[in-house]
Amino acid sequence: MTTLRIATRKSPLALWQSEHVADALRQHHPGLEVVLVPMSTRGDEVLDRSLAAIGGKGLFLKELELAMLRGEADCAVHSLKDVPMELDEPFVLPAILERGDPADALVSNLYASLQALPLGARVGTSSLRRQAQLRAARPDLELIDLRGNVNTRLAKLDNGGYDAIVLACAGLQRLGLEARISARLDAPEWLPAPAQGAVAVECRGDDARIHSLLAVLDAGRTRVCVEAERAMNRALHGSCHVPVAAFARWEGQDLFLQGMVGSASDGRLIHADAHGSADDTEALGRRVAQGLFDKGAAQLLAEL
């Protein structure tokens, strides 16, 4: 019997996503034994500083990639929004699964919407993208850093540290916590992180056997959308240091891509969008990025 080892972070959401991939692989390959290799990453361990301050979301990947290089794991499962725009050699993404809910969620025990929050309410999020959009919608809010896994963040809310917090809908839904969603924060008014809601599987590009096993999970229509979003982010040189948002959707045979760059300090937002061919997501991403630059995104980004 062939065995495939999946490196994964230890958080409940990461384990859910990895088990979801494992179940799909078992269905496609009935003779395949799939085991999880849970690991802790620096991004999980350092919770008293923002991701931007300690090196970015790539910290969630490095230990898992090292495990693959050492031969301790065959692949790794990630939230695609945490994956850097450029992968280090020799890594590739042979599978991007069908996208979950891309929206953000406002979670509060007392208030049913962003508009219902009282003047000066305390809202928890460490995402610069979320902070920028919150400041644009409600300049009066007090925004407070919030790190940790989904359950940790909810516990901090429940302990009274915040009036509300902002999380990804997909994470709450995958953990059976959809009832905690007070209000959805949806496109086009509120844009998600590039590739939010999508799960990706990473492996070594020189491992043809593993690549072949994983490729059957790839959802082509999802891949096209998230590649356009990531192409825009790449053209902007975006990272977790930068408040960048993007969302692509199918319109007939073409894609419609919306992009945003914002300021977490004062809530200035710059938007651009474009239609384009699904056959050239790179060009579509660059076109929306150029639209943002034409409206002053370079100056805004230079201030960060």
Curated annotation (Swiss-Prot):
Pathway(s) of this molecule: Porphyrin-containing compound metabolism; protoporphyrin-IX biosynthesis; coproporphyrinogen-III from 5-aminolevulinate: step 2/4
EC assignment: 2.5.1.61
GO molecular function: hydroxymethylbilane synthase activity
Catalytic activity: 4 porphobilinogen + H2O = hydroxymethylbilane + 4 NH4(+)
Name of the top EC class for this enzyme: transferase
Entry keyword annotation includes Transferase: yes
One Pfam family of this chain: Porphobil_deamC
SUPFAM superfamilies: Periplasmic binding protein-like II, Porphobilinogen deaminase (hydroxymethylbilane synthase), C-terminal domain
BP terms from Gene Ontology: protoporphyrinogen IX biosynthetic process
Subunit structure: Monomer.
Residues that bear S-(dipyrrolylmethanemethyl)cysteine: 240
Summary of the function given for this chain in its UniProt record: Tetrapolymerization of the monopyrrole PBG into the hydroxymethylbilane pre-uroporphyrinogen in several discrete steps.
Note: The porphobilinogen subunits are added to the dipyrromethane group.
CDD domains for the chain: PBP2_EcHMBS_like
Highest taxon listed in the record's lineage: Bacteria
Keywords: Porphyrin biosynthesis, Transferase
Record-level GO cellular component terms: cytoplasm
PROSITE patterns registered for this protein in UniProt: PORPHOBILINOGEN_DEAM
Protein's name in the database: Porphobilinogen deaminase
Record family assignment: Belongs to the HMBS family.
Cofactor binding description: Binds 1 dipyrromethane group covalently.
Cofactors demanded by this protein: dipyrromethane
